[in-house]
Design a protein with these regions (language model features):
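N-terminal secretory signal peptides that target proteins for export/translocation
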Residues: 1-3
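Sec-dependent N-terminal signal peptides of Gram-positive bacterial secreted proteins and lipoproteins
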Residues: 5-25
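Intrinsically disordered, low-complexity Ser/Thr- and Pro-rich stretches
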Residues: 10, 32-33, 39, 45, ...
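Short Gly/charged-rich anion-binding patches and loops
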Residues: 11, 79, 287
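Secreted/extracellular small peptides and ectodomain modules produced from precursors
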Residues: 17, 21, 168, 332-333, ...
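Sec-dependent signal peptide cleavage junction
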Residues: 18-38
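Solvent-exposed alpha-helical segments and adjacent loops
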Residues: 36-184
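Asp-box/BNR beta-propeller blade signature and adjacent active/binding-site loops
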Residues: 181-557
Length: 557
């Protein structure tokens, strides 16, 4: 064995010598006494991840953690959980923070709201009212709002703009740090309280000449009420309508109240009156109004603007009257008309239920009656059910109208805008709001002029509702508010499109992820943008009531 080792050593020496000769000739190699250094090998540690894999192949190692002490914490977490499960097809669990204490918590959490996690507290301290933060800390994702409603808005934003739509997969940037206060505008500082106006529904407001706020709504008939403290409380409630029968003998149903004051102070309340929805007789439909000459204490007899009696029970007719003072001082009434009738009549009935017109009638102050009317927006020409018109004045003397329309087959309904110099002749409609997802719904629009010339637009929309989608889109809707980026006038109205408006991320009248806020309206009054809507439980017909929420105008930025 020793001989083998010696032979191997000798062979190695010969090979080394031959290599030295072949590489360096016969010269002796240089000898140095300096210490030799060897560079450290390159690091073999993997690079920092560029993304967080929330879910892959339909599975996730993450857990949604919500705040046990938040009223709607469970609902919001369940909303996110359901999105992962139903839309992305990713299995993910959710628990409250008390079930997964911070000191025992592991990584891989999606932390929602005001939990006991230190990072949640740190993020919330940096936020103002109406703001939220979505960001990564370590291997966990934090979705945190200043309050519960802001957290809900953050979850909606995460779903719509960050989570993606690829099924069985969800990956987000590892350096995600989104602050809505820095990235999004406008921001409205909604007042904390939501004010109960009444039971009932479909409320519409106006400011009277004496500075009081007036409202019309339906609740066992058409009601009229006054507020002397900017909507905080309501008094002097009057029932405008009286029980009556249709020409067919059915009990009249009243809805869609609208209020305006004109001239020397007369107050007009308009509404629709029609057969009940369960009528087994022919269908009767009408638009009516009543006038008060004593400040809303009493109202005169109803006057019919338009009426029709159909030969079947199809629920088609006249809907949602809205009134405005035109630039020339006249009073105009707009309403939706999907009344199917003879095409050779002197009134523009629609040929089928696939279409709906917007009508306009002008009021004669002397006779206190409206004219025969004309089409303001032609649903047949637009191949659409143009509906639910609301009109307001622009800062330069023009007029703007918002409608819901269904010509775009990608969506159930979208919101469109038209412009006019006189309130009679209107431009072609342009789309200003469409849902973020195909098949979804944005309807029942409203528009209000802000003091700086910008427009506030609201609608009810399913893309920001937490309800499980069903065939009834209305019952799955939440009130959304949008603000135009710049003042809108007749001079620049041709440039208006969807990019002209930015959504206020916090929905004003949400009472938890499984509630609806529908038939919304807005009104600018005494320094406030006041929102009103019917609030109830999603997927049911029971309405909790009509609620109001205010935002000081000077908080809009």
């Amino acid at each position: 064995m020793k001989n083998i080792i010696r032979f191997a050593s000798l062979a190695l020496s010969v090979i080394t010598l031959l290599c030295a000769v072949s590489c360096g000739g016969t010269e002796k190699p240089a000898v140095t006494t300096e210490p030799t250094t060897t560079e450290a090998p390159a690091s073999t540690e993997p690079p920092a991840p560029t993304e967080l894999v929330i879910g892959e192949n339909g599975k996730s190692q993450y857990t949604i953690v919500y705040a046990a002490n938040e009223e709607y914490g469970h609902d919001t977490a369940f909303y996110l959980h359901r999105y992962f499960r139903e839309q992305l097809k990713i299995s993910i669990d959710y628990v409250k923070d008390s079930e997964r204490p911070a000191e025992k918590a592991e990584a891989f959490e999606i932390v929602v709201g005001r939990t006991d996690r230190d990072a949640s507290t740190a993020f919330r301290k940096k936020l103002k009212s109406g703001e939220f933060y979505i960001g990564v800390e370590g291997s966990s994702l934090y979705i945190v709002g200043r309050g519960e409603e802001e957290t809900r808005a953050a979850v909606e934003y995460f779903i719509d703009y960050i989570a993606g739509t690829e099924q069985k997969s969800c990956k987000i940037p590892a350096d995600l740090a989104f602050d809505s206060g820095e990235e999004l505008s406008p921001v409205l500082e909604w007042e904390k309280s939501k004010i109960l106006l009444s039971a009932g529904g479909y409320a519409r407001m106006t400011t009277l000449k004496n500075g009081e706020l007036a409202v019309g709504y339906s609740n066992g008939g058409i009601k009229f009420a006054i507020s002397t403290n900017d909507g905080k409380g309501w008094t002097n409630t009057v029932t405008v309508t009286k029980p009556a029968k249709t020409p067919l003998g059915d009990t009249l149903t009243y809805a869609n109240a609208n209020v305006i004051q004109y001239g020397d102070g007369d107050i007009m309340v308009a509404y629709r009156a029609h057969s009940p929805t369960n009528s087994t007789k022919n269908f009767y439909t009408s638009i009516r109004y009543q006038i008060s000459k004593d400040g809303g204490k009493t109202f005169g007899d109803p006057v019919i603007v338009v009426e029709y009696q159909r030969n079947d029970t199809d629920f088609k007719g006249f809907w949602e009257p809205h009134m405005v003072i035109l630039p020339d001082g006249r009073l105009a009434m707009y309403y939706a008309n999907d009344c199917i009738g003879p095409q050779d009549a002197d009134y523009p009935y629609v040929p089928s239920g696939s279409y709906q017109h917007i009508m306009v009638h002008v009021f004669d102050y002397e006779t206190e009656t409206f004219d025969k009317g004309t089409i303001a927006s032609n649903g047949v020409d637009h191949k659409s059910r143009d509906g639910m018109p609301v009109v307001c004045n622009l800062s330069d003397g023009g007029l703007v109208m918002v409608i819901e329309a269904n010509w775009d087959k990608n969506y159930a309904f979208i919101i469109q805008m038209l412009f006019s110099e006189d309130g009679i002749n209107w431009s072609d409609p342009v789309t200003v709001i469409s849902p973020t997802k195909k098949g979804h719904y944005a309807g029942a629009p409203y528009v209000a002029l802000l003091p700086d010339g910008r427009l506030a637009v609201s609608c009810q929309a399913t893309q920001y509702s937490g309800a499980t989608m069903s065939s009834d889109l209305v019952q799955n809707s939440q009130m959304n508010v949008y603000i135009s980026k710049e003042p809108i006038t007749l001079a620049n109205c041709k440039d208006v499109n969807e990019k002209s408006f930015v959504k206020v991320m916090e929905n004003p009248l949400s009472m938890g992820v499984e509630t609806r806020s529908i038939w919304p309206a807005m009104h600018v009054h005494n320094g406030y943008l006041i929102c009103v809507a019917d609030i109830g439980t999603n997927l049911s017909t029971g309405v909790t009531g009509i609620y109001i929420r205010r935002a000081p105008i000077d908080t809009i930025k």
